[in-house]
Amino acid sequence: MSYTVIYAGTFDPITNGHLDIITRATKLFAKVIVAVAQNPTKQPLFSLSERTALVAQSCSHLTNVEAVSFSGLLADFARQHHAKALIRGIRGSDDIEYEIQLSQLNNKLADGLETVFLPPAVEWRYLSSTMIREIYYHQGQVNAFVPTAVVQALQNRKNNE
């Protein structure tokens, strides 16, 4: 399809689960904008510009992906970028009710904006950025769970502490 879609999140940091969803979305849609959100209610490990750069580096092999940072309403961002749909990953039943509510709200706010739900590959179903940060804070190894750019950024952060 020749549609632009948006996959939004804080991506703090981007994980292999996120990358799986992005890669699969690129096979379904002409352009995937990975919208890296500024969320004032969260204290991120990486700054907005760092997170956006990590997404861009991690997706550099995907020619139809663009990493863009944003703040404000996702519905407004989608309208500005002429997106036809949002991509959302659903790991399990815990995510479904919340994601359906978001989908309906964004549909109303952006006049018909659709949401496409993609479950992650089985090997990434349990994975979240929160878990990666926990492993990192406790000096664990995250190499198997995140793209190389994130491994390097975490190592650099650890070396500078």
Curated annotation (Swiss-Prot):
Its cofactor is Mg(2+). Its main location: cytoplasm. Gene3D superfamilies: HUPs (3.40.50.620). GO terms for cellular component: cytoplasm. Disulfide bonds: none annotated. Reversibly transfers an adenylyl group from ATP to 4'-phosphopantetheine, yielding dephospho-CoA (dPCoA) and pyrophosphate. HAMAP family: PPAT_bact. NCBIfam families: coaD_prev_kdtB (TIGR01510), cyt_tran_rel (TIGR00125). Belongs to the bacterial CoaD family. This is Phosphopantetheine adenylyltransferase. It comes from Haemophilus ducreyi (strain 35000HP / ATCC 700724). The lineage of its organism: Bacteria, Pseudomonadati, Pseudomonadota, Gammaproteobacteria, Pasteurellales. The gene is coaD.
